[in-house]
């Protein structure tokens, strides 16, 4: 049987350290999601307004965030702001800022798409029934939009969790960084440990994201 180096995880507190690193990744994701969801909803609603200047500004922001790789944004926020403005940002704070910028852009586009997908005749019918604009949104538009958005926003959460693997590049000790440290510390005693440890990291990410993906799929089928 091939030596996968899994015994390294049983030494000392290596497995506990890996789980702690996963906790850091999940914490960054959770904070970023909690901030970016309401901001994304607000910007998504604003993107449906007919003000050309506002739409242009928001579109430029959306395209900039989409085109720019997350790793470049991490370097720009973490290293660039430190040099340019003298800010003392921790790696985790810089990561949250970047993921909030990214998550807000993605969520705003989802909200915009969900709102413009509502047929115009529903607005017209509600107006014909004597409903105010606020009543139209509260009783007709928002319930439909929420049903469209929840599965998509849950998928955004899984994408954010997986993308946190990039934050090791700015020194955040998350699960992948811990895995590298364990491999380096045991390179001589267990030269084959890399495969087993990275396999464990894969399983941890899978266990973190799989239930969320199942929930998104279930809701999408239920509300289709």
Predicted regions and their residues:
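Transmembrane alpha-helices and adjacent helix-loop boundaries
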Residues: 1-224
């Amino acid at each position: 049987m091939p030596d996968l180096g899994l015994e390294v995880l049983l030494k000392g507190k290596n497995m506990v350290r890996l789980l702690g690193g996963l906790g850091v990744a999940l914490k960054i994701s959770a904070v970023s999601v909690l901030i970016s969801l309401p901001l994304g909803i607000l910007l998504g609603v604003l993107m449906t307004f007919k003000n050309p200047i506002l739409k242009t500004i928001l579109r430029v922001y959306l395209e900039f965030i989409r085109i720019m790789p997350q790793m470049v944004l991490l370097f720009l926020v973490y290293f660039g702001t430190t040099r340019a403005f003298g800010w003392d940002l921790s790696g985790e704070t810089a990561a949250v800022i970047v993921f909030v910028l990214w998550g807000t852009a993605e969520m705003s586009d989802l909200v915009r798409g969900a709102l413009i997908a509502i047929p115009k005749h529903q607005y017209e019918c509600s107006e014909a029934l004597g409903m105010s604009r606020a009543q139209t949104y509260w009783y007709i538009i928002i319930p439909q939009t929420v049903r469209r958005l929840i599965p998509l926003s849950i998928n955004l959460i899984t994408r954010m969790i997986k993308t946190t693997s990039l934050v090791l590049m700015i020194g955040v000790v998350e699960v992948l960084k811990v895995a590298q440290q364990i491999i380096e510390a045991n390179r001589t005693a267990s030269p084959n440990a890399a495969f087993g440890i990275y396999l464990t990291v894969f399983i941890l990410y899978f266990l973190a994201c799989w239930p969320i993906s199942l929930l998104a799929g279930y809701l999408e089928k239920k509300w289709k």
